[in-house]
């Protein structure tokens, strides 16, 4: 191990960890952004250098953001196969773009509710920024596993019902949606 966290994600993990971490610089700090298995986005301060061999460092939490504050946080496994109410998780990689962080989160594809969001977060805070740093939230009626793709002021994500969403990154409003054909 090069590093570890002390945020206690394991007991709040509804299914498993899906998200790849992302690295970016915000306000002169190099941060590691991680979409947690518990529906929280975590920003950790990156290590400045590798620790001495045999040493395991603890990453320092810069901030965290709950993508589903209304979702259950206790006894989460009792919601297994509950398609209406369940904890959320994050399957996508957070994307830092022009001073904002974008991530999709929502119910687990196999075991959870059929609801998700594309979130835009101001990544400059500290501590729990859930109530203070959400720029906007775009709801989707189905699960979402895709990492946002951002170009020319637009975010593109596809949900698990086969709908591609194009969202204006300034307003969080849909520009268009398109139902793709598939099996």
Report the location of each language-model feature:
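Noncatalytic, solvent-exposed loop/strand surfaces
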Residues: 1-183
